[in-house]
Amino acid sequence: MLNVTDLSSYLYCPRQFYFRKIVGLRDPATQPMIEGSLRHKVREVFANNEENLFENLELINNNLTKQKVTSFYQNFLDQIIKQVFNNSQGLIYKFRINKEELREKIIKSMENEIKLRAESVENTIKQGFTGKELWENLTPKYISELPLISESLGLKGRADRIMIDKNKQTIIPFELKTRDAKTIYPSDEVQLTSYAMLLEEKYNQPIPFAILEAGNTIHELTITDSNKQKVRDLINEINELFKTKKPKFPSNFSKCQNCFFTQHCESLED
């Protein structure tokens, strides 16, 4: 089964995808790669344990302000960062990662996550909910690192963030990037559309649009039938590659500069 990230990887360079996914070659680990994996791990642990916060009924009451909720989440995040770093001491030492710098980057990248959640918690508390009922009735509810799978599409993925608004009966997938983006690139469009399709199947309701949150820029993508067909065609094209084992060249050969797979790519033509 393909992963959503496989689709964007194939779009970037079919040959890189071929060597990674079909031949089984691996890129050498680098400091940025390890830092990225640690950031994703923090987000994953954050998402998996967020509901447990609301079991402490005494900590959440009708007098809890957004500022206090924000502090509540910040302390929660800080504990998770320490936990992930403690469990990854070997990698951190091997790749000479500055823990304090990475900690600040993670906190910065999670600022909006915490802000959105704090606003939602404050508004739901005002409706009289506390504790577990508060979690169950949060609206809008933001869920990070949500695993999704579709047997019919042959596709799976983990959405960076989704927003569920029960009042408006709306579900919105978000793709988060650290870089600013002037526009939605084809790879972003494929990822956003893929997550929308996976969510439509999971929740059995239409997903009209998705959002790319890239650095300080926000772009909205309307999910059309044409977008969906592009995803289906791409899935079929990639599945065909597993049979033919004849990958296409990238659309732009500037991508070949400093590519780890250059030697393997040249030997493929022999």
Residue locations for each model-derived region?
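Catalytic cores of nuclease domains that cleave nucleic-acid phosphodiester backbones
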Residues: 62-175
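Metal-dependent nuclease catalytic regions and adjoining charged, substrate-binding loops involved
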Residues: 151-154, 182-186, 198-270
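Short alpha-helix boundary/capping segments
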Residues: 30-31, 183-190
